[in-house]
């Protein structure tokens, strides 16, 4: 089996100049595997009828699942390609920053370091322009975070922060520190959260809740299935099928 012309062309757009091409070495050492992966990920999946995404959204979702699944080597390959397809440095950083709330700094730090190296190699001046809209004031962060929760999940979240210190931190830290930032809008932030949760596994209740939140703000069921489909080559079938089950459960709960 040879790599299809479409897959070759798509990889050509992904990897420019002297950037390392995904599976380039494997085409020499493991040609049968590499040919099949390239054809599947960079042709069949992308061209599946009614399952596509625009390239920029696809790469944002893929970056999020790579962080969620701790795929640092693949992240180092895909992040430059994402830049080539129009994902901005700010958007990459915002994806990484928000990941801390869902994966913890221990798992995210290697990706932040990797992104800085990639951006430095591209000549991007660091630090980037500030994106925070909330001050460091604890009350302001909580108030703005609560409003973000209400905007996304509904009015039932208005007093959620009163249910103990973890719920307070969810309001002031997870939503107040991250969701209120510029660089990504609510729909993009909920999409990447869905990707973090789907990729890491073991948090299906939260994944179902965020699938419902996505639908409430306009990322409908069909969109989420497209996200799962485009990310499947990177996270595999079990977690993709689990994510699909969560999407179906969320849809059923909203229709009840």
Question: How should these model regions be labeled?
Answer:
Residues 76-78, 204-212:
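Short conserved catalytic/interaction loops centered on acidic-Pro-aromatic/His motifs
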Residues 1-56, 69, 76, 108-187, ...:
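Acidic, glycine/proline-rich low-complexity segments that act as flexible tails and inter-domain linkers
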Residues 78-114:
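Hydrophobic/aromatic-rich structural module bridging two neighboring secondary-structure elements via a short loop
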Residues 54, 88-91, 185, 218-222:
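Helix N-cap / loop-to-helix initiation motif
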Residues 67, 85, 98-105, 198, ...:
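A short structural micro-motif
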Residues 209-211, 217-231, 235:
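Extended hydrophobic/aromatic segments used for targeting, binding, or gating
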Residues 57-66, 75, 95-96, 188-198, ...:
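Short, structured motif recognition centered on aromatic/hydrophobic residues
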């Amino acid at each position: 089996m040879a790599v299809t012309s479409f897959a070759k062309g798509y990889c050509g757009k992904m990897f420019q100049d002297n950037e390392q091409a995904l599976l380039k070495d494997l085409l020499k050492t493991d040609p049968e595997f590499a040919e099949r992966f390239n054809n599947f990920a960079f042709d069949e999946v992308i061209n599946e009828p009614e399952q596509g995404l625009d390239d920029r959204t696809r790469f944002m979702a893929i970056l999020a699942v790579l962080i969620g699944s701790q795929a640092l080597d693949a992240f180092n390959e895909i992040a430059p390609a994402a830049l080539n397809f129009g994902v901005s440095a700010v958007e990459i950083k915002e994806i990484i920053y928000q990941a801390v709330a869902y994966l913890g700094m221990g798992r995210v730090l290697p990706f932040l370091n990797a992104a800085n190296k990639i951006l430095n190699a591209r000549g991007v001046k660091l630090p980037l322009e500030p994106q925070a809209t909330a001050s460091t004031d604890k009350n302001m962060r909580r108030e703005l975070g609560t409003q973000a929760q209400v905007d996304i999940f509904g009015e039932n979240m208005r007093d959620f922060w009163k249910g103990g210190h973890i719920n307070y931190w969810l309001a002031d830290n997870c939503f107040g520190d991250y969701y209120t930032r510029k660089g990504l809008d609510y729909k993009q932030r909920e999409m990447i959260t869905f990707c973090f949760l789907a990729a890491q596994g073991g948090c299906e209740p939260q994944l179902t809740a965020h699938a419902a939140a996505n639908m409430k703000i306009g990322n409908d069921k069909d969109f989420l299935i497209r996200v799962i489909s485009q990310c499947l080559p990177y996270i595999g079938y079990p977690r993709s099928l689990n994510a699909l089950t969560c999407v179906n459960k969320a849809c059923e709960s909203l229709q009840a």
